[in-house]
């Protein structure tokens, strides 16, 4: 397993902050509070279009390493539960979170734009907008259920910094 080289503590991890651990082998994301309390565990994928052990090329798995949540795009708040067809909404789902690399893990392999989002064009419309849409591979992002992004991840961003560690097959 390939793991992050750094920890949230290297970037000022403090009370109110959260650490989400994404394990692509188990297909789970687990959130931990600053004091080590397990907050929740949900299904997720950190898979791209390539081999299970490949993340160094465009459209392959999420590069392993430590990230933090940056910009938030809350399309669900803008358009509600029953929007008309839209390609962007279909691809990214209810809410998208930019993941800011903290280990140069994207740039060193010529990648950029890794996110955590829902949706899934392979699910069609309105399937990609469903609360618990099937999790399909991405072009390298972390995909979660739309409702988990809204009900579990989004509230954490209001409390403090959310760090995300991605573990990949090696």
Regions found by a protein language model. Give the residues of each.
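Exported/periplasmic cell-wall-interacting domains
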Residues: 76-170
């Amino acid at each position: 397993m390939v793991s992050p080289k750094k920890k949230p503590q290297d970037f000022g991890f403090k009370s109110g902050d959260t650490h989400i651990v994404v394990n692509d082998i188990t297909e789970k994301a687990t959130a931990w509070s600053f004091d080590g309390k397990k907050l929740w565990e949900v299904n997720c994928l950190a898979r791209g279009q390539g081999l299970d052990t490949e993340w160094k090329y465009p459209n392959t798995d999420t590069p392993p390493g430590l990230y933090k949540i940056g910009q938030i795009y809350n399309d669900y708040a803008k358009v509600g539960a029953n929007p008309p067809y839209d390609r962007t909404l279909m691809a990214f789902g209810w809410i998208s979170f930019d993941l800011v690399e903290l280990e140069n893990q994207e740039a060193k392999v010529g990648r950029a734009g890794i996110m955590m989002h829902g949706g899934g064009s392979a699910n069609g419309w309105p399937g990609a907008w469903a609360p618990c849409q099937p999790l399909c591979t991405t072009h390298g992002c972390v995909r979660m259920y739309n409702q988990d992004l809204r009900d579990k991840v989004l509230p954490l961003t209001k409390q403090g910094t959310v760090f995300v560690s991605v573990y990949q097959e090696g």
